[in-house]
Curated annotation (Swiss-Prot):
Induction: By leucine and by growth in rich medium. Repressed by LeuO. Part of the sdaCB operon. Serine transport is strongly inhibited by KCN, an inhibitor of the respiratory chain, or by CCCP. The keyword Transmembrane applies. Disruption phenotype: Disruption of the gene leads to phage C1 adsorption defect. Mutation does not impair vitamin B12 utilization. Inactivation also leads to increased ampicillin resistance. Mutant is resistant to phage C6. Mutation also confers resistance to ColV. Deletion mutant lyses upon glucose depletion in the absence of exogenous serine. It comes from Escherichia coli (strain K12). This is Serine transporter SdaC. One of its GO terms (molecular function) is symporter activity. The gene is sdaC. GO terms for biological process: amino acid transport; L-serine transport. The chain crosses the membrane at residues 23-43, 47-67, 100-120, 141-161, 164-184, 202-222, 250-270, 298-318, 348-368, 370-390, 407-427.
Length: 429
């Protein structure tokens, strides 16, 4: 009896200890969330003045952590280990709702994958012609080489995808922090002049309006919902009934890392420029690094910008691929199940990979202008799945009821509604 108790305690201790795989997933979560959008964040978040920026910095961690923890708990609440988000929604909400949410989930994430395929082609093409002084190959060939390169990592499976992302995080964070430190001597007091509660700098809007419209910017800057389901499934297989505690710990560390590194970079950029500079950068629709390179006449920043963007896009593409694959697989499995058929998962993964390769290549070659609009329409769906669905499940699903009664649930719902309303306002204004 004593031996059994000792071995149980020992196994619990070994499961509660931090593992190498936990670090890998922590960096994988960071890698999915912090993409090339971080290069526009200082402009989009800073143009409204210092007060909204400070408030957003305070809200960033709780907003990101509580929402993603809710979605992770939702995936973990499925009856059977190995059930991803597409299976759990069907289990909790029925076959019809399961199919609809799976469809929405796919169409919210898949366009982001298409945007990344266009973005990496544009960035490499620009880097070759401007920085390297080379004539880039035809767009169709260049995009094919780049997408095949990223899809090669996908062929080695989920573990390899997360490993590749975690490796790419190191140079990305390193360069981001070096840039933030490099800008410190350029800090000036101009941004501090916008420390006013009644106006909000260059936007022409009041404080509350600026803050309201800035919330979605923060939500999507730290959003890594496409990888959450794969993360929860992997950790449940590894840790069993301790998965929820372990996932919460990994999420907390990933989010602390995200908020500290990104907000330090944002504040450093904002403090080194004037509000008029930020407004000019927004008007020109260029990344903060491109603007800084011209503003401080620093060619080294001009060189670094595309390199950082390429690393950022690659790791975010891989993270979003996991979510898009899950959605696509879910639609196929549910469709076949309705006809009484099934498909072997490795065969389905190969079909999905081929579909993703061909469609991302076609879109990257054609570079259609409607793509940005489609991606924007996916915004409210992501916000609903991330913020509202898990909170609804806490009220309605017995397996989730143990998480009810916390003030953080109210906070997540309020932030979700603010984000969704602001997205719709921006779309139709």
């Amino acid at each position: 009896m004593e031996t059994t108790q000792t071995s149980t305690i020992a196994s619990k201790d070994s499961r509660s200890a931090w593992r190498k795989t936990d670090t890998m997933w922590m960096l994988g979560l960071y890698g999915t969330a912090i993409g090339a959008g971080v290069l526009f964040l200082p402009i989009n978040a800073g143009v409204g003045g210092m007060i909204p920026l400070i408030i957003m910095a305070i809200l960033a961690f709780p907003m990101t952590f509580f929402a993603h923890r809710g979605l992770t708990r939702f995936v973990l609440s499925g009856k059977n280990p190995g059930e991803d988000i597409t299976e759990v929604v069907e289990e909790h909400f029925g076959i019809g709702a399961g199919k609809l949410i799976t469809l929405l989930y796919f169409f919210a994430i898949y366009p982001i994958l298409l945007v990344y395929s266009v973005a990496i082609t544009n960035t490499v093409e620009s880097f070759m012609s401007h920085q390297l002084g080379m004539t880039p190959p035809p767009r169709a060939i260049l995009s094919l080489i780049l997408i095949v390169g990223m899809m090669t990592i996908v062929r080695f499976g989920e573990q390899m995808i997360v490993k590749a992302m975690s490796i790419l995080v190191f140079p990305f964070v390193g360069v981001l922090m070096l840039l933030a430190l490099y800008l410190i001597p350029q800090w000036n007091g101009a941004a501090l002049e916008t420390l006013s509660l009644d106006t909000a700098s260059a936007t022409g809007n009041g404080l509350w309006m600026t803050l309201w419209l800035a919330i979605p910017v923060m939500v999507f800057s730290f959003n890594h919902s496409p990888i959450i389901s794969s993360f929860a499934v992997a950790k449940r297989e590894e840790y069993g009934d301790m998965a929820e505690q372990k996932c919460s710990k990994i999420l907390a560390f990933a989010h602390i890392m995200m908020v500290l590194t990104v907000m330090f970079f944002v504040f450093s950029c904002v403090l080194s420029l004037t509000p008029a500079d930020l407004a000019a950068a927004k008007e020109q629709n260029i990344s903060i690094l491109s603007y800084l390179a011209n503003h401080f006449n620093a060619p080294v920043i001009a060189w670094m910008a595309p390199i950082i963007a390429i690393i950022a896009i690659t790791k975010s593409f891989l993270g979003h691929y996991l979510g898009a694959r899950e959605g696509f697989n879910g639609m196929v499995i549910k469709s076949l199940r309705g006809k009484g058929k099934s498909i072997e998962i490795n065969k389905l993964n190969r079909i999905t990979a081929l579909f993703m390769l061909v469609t991302t290549w076609i879109v990257a070659t054609l570079n259609p202008s409607i793509l940005g609009m489609i991606e924007t329409l996916g915004g409210p769906i992501i916000a609903m799945i991330l913020f509202l669905m898990p909170m609804y499940a806490i009220q309605k699903v017995p397996a989730m009821r143990k998480y009810s009664g916390h003030i953080s649930n109210v906070f997540v719902v309020v932030m979700g509604l603010i984000a969704i309303s602001a997205i719709f306002y921006s779309l139709f204004s």
